[in-house]
Amino acid sequence: MTEFTKLRWLLSAAGLVMYVADVCTDAALVLTYFKEKHVVCAALTLLFIVVGLLVTQVFSTAWYWDDMDCDEKREDMKTTLPVVSKRGLATLHLFGVGIFIRYYQMLKRGFGVAWGTVEPVEEIKNQQHFLFGLAADLSMLRLLEAFLESVPQLLLQLYIVLGQQECSLVQLVGMSFSFMNAAWALVDYRRCLRRSLPDVRQMPRGLPTAIYLLYKLFTITSRVLGYALLLIFSIYSTVGLAIVWLLGTAWTHRLHTDFCSSQSLEFLYRAIVGVILTFTFFNVKGQGTRDAMITYYFLHSLINVLSLLLLFVLRPDLLTLAALLCVSTLMAACSVLGLVCLVLYYLLLHPTEACREADEVDGLEIKTRSKGRLRDFLYP
């Protein structure tokens, strides 16, 4: 049986620290921009923070309500806030503490399991089961927050830094934490997803995890750099980004996803998936992905080449030659290394499963609502 170990507890605590640090550095950026009279930059930075916070609170509330309405919920699977009503939970989330409540639940119960303060064997099994359900919900919320706040924040800061051709300490720290927060969310989500699938081997630690992480980080970095160059070329490139988002949202809508219990939340979910697809590839509904992935990364490479050509040929005055060569080299290297890591992972390191296609699919029997949500969410 998979166990919630001391290491898992410590990593969960580290994830909470990373989340708080990312929010704090972004808040520091907002204050810095306001002090420097950069009102637009401050407003955009604050907007990304608020959007990420608001969306995660909405989904966290909806999932708590779904769990409270679940007829099959057992006594040991209930929330650690039994005296709180639906209205009370909504009020707590209104103050933006939804993720903190979930971390409190997981760290409190996880401490008892990992450090052996829970005695009966059956109780330990129940707690293990509940803890991995909490981890599943948190991994999805952190992924949403990463692509609605951290990654757009990284794009904005890169655009500002490249445009000004200088980088302050606050900007450097903010970009670093946004980068690490996105990386943490990606790996944690991947591991939680595979752990939730009953007939699928867990994602191995060590080299496979490192290669998968590098694949995602390299491809996201090259994509963000390409978008930043397009924005430097013309601020009207935001129209192009909006079109890319609309295409991703339309594709998700065409797949008829059924992640949410309400139609309005389902439309919001599809719009968010469109944002995620703007920056990285995810298997939206467990269908075969080879052709879709090839098409996606071909277009990804095309956008990167286009952004470089536009700056080199039409607006070489916007960046110094040294800066342009540095960004071009970094973007090309990240694109190549990301695709190499992608091929290495899926050819040599991806866990093979018996009685299952290469891509995990929906429709399996589930043991908890949290794990059921996870299987219907996204497939990396």
From Swiss-Prot:
The keyword Transmembrane is assigned to this record: yes
Report the transmembrane regions from the record.
10-30, 39-59, 81-101, 167-187, 228-248, 264-284, 294-314, 329-349
Q: InterPro entries attached here?
A: XK-rel, XK-related_scramblase
As for subcellular location, the record says: Cell membrane
Identify the GO cellular component terms for this protein: plasma membrane
Q: Which Pfam families match?
A: XK-related
Q: Which reaction does it catalyse?
A: a 1,2-diacyl-sn-glycero-3-phospho-L-serine(in) = a 1,2-diacyl-sn-glycero-3-phospho-L-serine(out)
The superkingdom listed in its UniProt entry is Eukaryota
How is it placed in the membrane, per its record? Multi-pass membrane protein
* Keywords of the record: Cell membrane, Membrane, Transmembrane, Transmembrane helix
**Known role:** Phospholipid scramblase that promotes phosphatidylserine exposure on apoptotic cell surface. Phosphatidylserine is a specific marker only present at the surface of apoptotic cells and acts as a specific signal for engulfment.
Assigned protein family: Belongs to the XK family.
Q: Which PANTHER family match?
A: XK-RELATED PROTEIN, XK-RELATED PROTEIN 9
Protein name, entry field: XK-related protein 9
Give the species.
Answer: Tetraodon nigroviridis
Gene field = xkr9
